[in-house]
Amino acid sequence: MAKRNAVVVTHTRLRQTGTVVAEAVSQLRVAGFEVTIIDNTEAPDFGVQPPCVSDDTEIVVVLGGDGTILRAAELVHCTQVPILGVNMGHVGFLAEFESFQIDEAIRRVATHDYSIDERMIAHVDVWLPGATKPIEDWALNDITLERADRGKMVELSIRVDDVEMNSFGADGVIVSTPTGSTAYAFSAGGPVMWPNVKALQLIPLAAHALFARPLIIGSGSTFTIDILDDSMSEGWICCDGRRQRALPQGTRVMVRESRDTLRLARLSGMPFTNRLVSKFDLPVVGWREHARNEASSQPLHHGHTFPAAAYAAGVAGDAGVAGTEPDKPGERDGKAGA
């Protein structure tokens, strides 16, 4: 029988990690895997590729949140080895299972009962002033270029396919993949992009400009971001919140789709739309509909109820009782709107 190798990447600071790791490793070994545990992955320097897992690794099982999955991505970026995420964090958007489902997850891995979801990766070239070749890096989620001086703006010029689109002072910009569109880019006001969309988006951060809106480009295009020579602040680049370095004035940053992809193991056929609604707990019923539903059970003076349609019209049929004012936006269920 051929040897089967698995790598388990863990989040060391989560209280419940130890028990789940022990269970996962035990079950993998029972299934015939030789298991390597990685529990401390320091962020490498920008432009430096850390050692990857061996090509004969069958799967990398990640026990943690999305941040732990991003750490694991550095170990498989240069391989075809898939990642299976078991969520032990908060949202766990990239994870496939929750920690209480670890038994089923390992069983499915052992029987090869999973599909592969290939995710687009962004490639970045950083040209320092006077450089003859770029510093290269990549990102599964996003690449941020922000001001190095917290008290000043960084002055940027934005080009798409060598055509200048805009220039402004700002806190910085985010360039996001579809995978990263539900992360920092989403918090900064960018749209959600479905994973099968081959595109990159650029979101300005607090730009001092009349026109500074998110831009989306196709997979054959390139974002070019120049830190202007007279910028008040130097820049600071960061890939996936981990690999980072300072950038002086006059630096050029070019971001495009990478030829590589990252492979996520999927154990269910849940569409991305369902995953989006579930993970973000989206309020799919608007506040007006919520008010109608509440009204359908409102008692009349005679101890009866009237239908929601009558409530919405402000009357209650023959009873002649006017509907009360519906809830205001933001006051339903104590939840903020999506």
Curated annotation (Swiss-Prot):
Pfam families documented for this protein: NAD_kinase (PF01513), NAD_kinase_C (PF20143)
Active site positions, chain numbering: D66
Example GO BP: NADP biosynthetic process
Protein keywords: ATP-binding, Cytoplasm, Kinase, NAD, NADP, Nucleotide-binding, Transferase
Ranges of biased composition (kind: Basic and acidic residues): 325-338
Binding positions for NAD(+) per the UniProt entry: D66, G67, R71, N141, D142, K152, D171, T182, A183, Y184, A185, F186, S187, A206
Key word Manganese present: no
Enzyme Commission code: 2.7.1.23
One cellular component term from this protein's GO annotations in UniProt: cytoplasm
InterPro entries, sorted: ATP-NAD_kinase_N (IPR017438), ATP-NAD_kinase_PpnK-typ_C (IPR017437), NAD/diacylglycerol_kinase_sf (IPR016064), NADK (IPR002504)
Single annotated GO MF: ATP binding
Broad enzyme group: transferase
UniProt entry tagged with the keyword Transferase: yes
Localisation: Cytoplasm
Cofactor: a divalent metal cation
Swiss-Prot/TrEMBL catalytic activity: NAD(+) + ATP = ADP + NADP(+) + H(+)
Disordered: annotated segments: 317-338
Function: Involved in the regulation of the intracellular balance of NAD and NADP, and is a key enzyme in the biosynthesis of NADP. Catalyzes specifically the phosphorylation on 2'-hydroxyl of the adenosine moiety of NAD to yield NADP.
Family: Belongs to the NAD kinase family.
The protein, known as: NAD kinase
